[in-house]
Structures are given as structure tokens and as C-alpha cells.
Amino acid sequence: PLFDPDWADNLIRLATSADLHYAYLEIDVPQIEGQSYRFPEGLDCEFISMEAIEAAFKGATDPYDREHVTPWIARKWQQFQKGSITPSIDYSGMKWSVDTQADLDFVRAVYMELAGIDFRMNNVIDLLTRKPELLEINGQTWRPEWIKAQ
């Protein structure tokens, strides 16, 4: 619910300019070694080329893989051209996805605070910088390095 279309646009530009089969925002992709900076969980965004989707359609036999596609691609990681966007600050401790009532309460609080504006990731970061107590709603802990230089 806290999706940022600007990051999606950046991801599409990266994927199309580099002719990638798969591109993603760094959230939690254990296949890539050495990456430590992550976007907030819930800001997930992926680009999958038609070529990769067709390969998954032809190669995936497990019902789970046929439904979700990405796990099959992850297991065949070496055969695809891939890339990612990594943030300049590590936001991996932030949880913006909705899996529990507390997560929903957090997202609702963010929406209430940012009501009336077409907000992006930076607006949410700015809000949480001003009101870090919002993070406590779903058990997040504020880290000073999350303050984004404007």
C-alpha cells in the first residue's frame, strides 16, 4: 500500500536500457551476495521480461512455480540477465507490508498523516523522521541512519 511509482519507473528504465530479463528493488533477495542496503519491506517491485516469463511457462512444472513465476526464475538465476536498484541508505528494518493487524494500523496511520498528497517513499521517510513513534505501531525500531539527506 506504500508503493512508489517513481521507483517502478526507475526499475523499468534500468531493465529496458540494460536488456535485463529480471530486475528488482533490493528488498530481500538472498541470491545476490554482498548486498547490504535494502528498501523497506513492502516497497517490493520487480520487472520480468516476456522472455523470462515464457521460459518459466515452458520450464516450470510445480504448481507453486506456475502460479508465482519468480521462485522458478530464482532457482534458474544463472540463466538470466538480472540487475537491481539498491538505496543509498539501508531501510531494511522498515516494514511497510501488511501481514498483521499492527501492520495495517501502521499503514493507516501513515495514510492519515499524509492525507491529501500524492506521496512517495521520501515523504514517508520524512514523516517517520518527524514522528518515529509511528514505527512502534507494528514493532519497528527507529534507526538514525534512516534520515534521508534532501
What function would you assign to each model-found segment?
Residues 1-38:
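Conserved donor-nucleotide/metal-binding helix-loop-beta segment in metal-dependent transferases, i.e.
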Residues 2, 47, 97-98:
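Short aromatic/basic micro-patch
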Residues 20-35, 51-55, 74-84:
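Short, flexible, basic/aromatic active-site loop/helix in glycosyltransferases
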Residues 45, 61-62, 95-96:
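A residue-level structural signature of the nucleotidyltransferase/glycosyltransferase Rossmann-like core
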Residues 45-57, 101-105:
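Conserved nucleotide-sugar donor-binding
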Residues 52, 56-73:
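Conserved catalytic/acceptor-binding region of the Class I
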Residues 67-150:
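Conserved alpha/beta core of the MobA/IspD/sugar-nucleotide pyrophosphorylase nucleotidyltransferase superfamily
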